[in-house]
Amino acid sequence: MSLIFDALQRSETERSGTKLPALSAATEVLRLAELHAAAERQSAAQPVSETAQSVDHDKIVAVEELPARAAIRVDGSNVGPINGTGKQQAAFPHFESLKCTIPPENRLVCLSQENTLAAEKFRFLGVTLKGLQRERQLKRVLITSTIPQEGKSMVATNLACTLGRTTQQKILLVEGDVRRPSLSDLFGAEKVAGLCECLLGERDLRKSVYHLVEPGIWFLPAGAVPKNPLELLQSATLSAMMNQLSSWFDWIIIDSPPVMPLADTSILARLADGILMVVRQGVTEKRHLERGLEAIDAKKLIGSVLNGSRRRTAADYYYAEPPS
């Protein structure tokens, strides 16, 4: 996390022309998530300070800029298609396909620019998450940011598509930003009913999830923007819905609203196993990041994505140089 704070400080220095004081190490709360996970694997008698010695604190992926509700309704068959192991996938229903016409100007690098550094960064992020999944309960991953325009939706979409193309697992992308839904536009897909209609009891859950064939994932869109989004998300139906979805899918990637100034994210975060914070160099201010981190359960923070990074590594030059 220290690298992200360093990057933000450099950006603010460039904008203001003055050198800002460095942040205290106490602000690096993302480290607590890894410390907590490591501590659970150690003996209760072992001091936390010893455990900290074996933890890699800077797992950062730099991505180039780029009233009461009705009970949840689920119907249909409990027998699904054949999975990658040749065995029948139990309790996985058939979902309607939704046609995508992905615009050429899209930023879905994992689909249209697979050989670029940005796409490789998302593959690295996927590998990292799969490694964490072997160590702890990690199926529902919430992607958020501190403020709008930091790239959280693009990160969520690219991550879901990357997992869908690199694994035999079933990946669901949930559009949790019900106030400002945008994912259908990213995929060039028709705007259809989804999460909100299901929470209102107007639509069956199985008919609210769609299969996006080309990306190889499933998609639960936000649906029509509700009049009372916060009340809708607070419904107990949402928890029941997430439990049902978890029984069907191997990964659930949730595109959440920004942490500030809405309460929506705190509701969705309670249902997530892990949280990824997206930070955009040149846009995010350190004070906003500090406040955003304070609003999230540190035990669920599994890492961060630095978007629009200008920091170059040896791998960057490998992808930048044309083959000789």
Model-derived features: where do they sit?
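P-loop NTP-binding module
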Residues: S2-S324
